[in-house]
Amino acid sequence: LRKKVYSFILNKPSLILEPSIGRGDLINYVSEKDDTIKFDMYEIDDTINILNKYISRDKVIFGDFLEQPIKTKYKTIIGNPPYKRMKTKTGNLYIDFVSRCYDLLEVGGELVFIIPKIFFKKKSAEDLLNNMKNNGTFTHTYHPDNKHLFEGASVDVIVFRYCKDGNING
């Protein structure tokens, strides 16, 4: 999936937002391919063992990404957000992450995420998806059709690339 995420990064960014770095797998892969790219990195779990020679712990902002006062708009955002169901406005953290990242995306920017495939059918994602479709395009999707890609989890995922074009229907 890391290879697919990297192949979907088409904006030639100098800076990428990664809102939930986990062990740093995506950043490691992207950095191995292009070590000139810088990252703004967030992670809620400050006890996580970051397995990445490209990430210095002091460069990671530890805390709840969804609560961070971020003013920067990004050309490229990548991620594999948590899939937990929690008491949030949508009931699913990954939907909240997509929504927040959509808001932080500049016009012409790309959002490349690994999320549960069910996202595109969730009632709680309907308004977000309509807003995204009215202001951009899902340009690429990849469905690996393998529910056992993640250690200790069984989830059917999809990788998508979304490009924010501004209001294409107005």
Label for each model-derived stretch:
Residues 1-8, 14-15, 20-51, 57, ...:
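Signature of N6-adenine DNA methyltransferases within the class I
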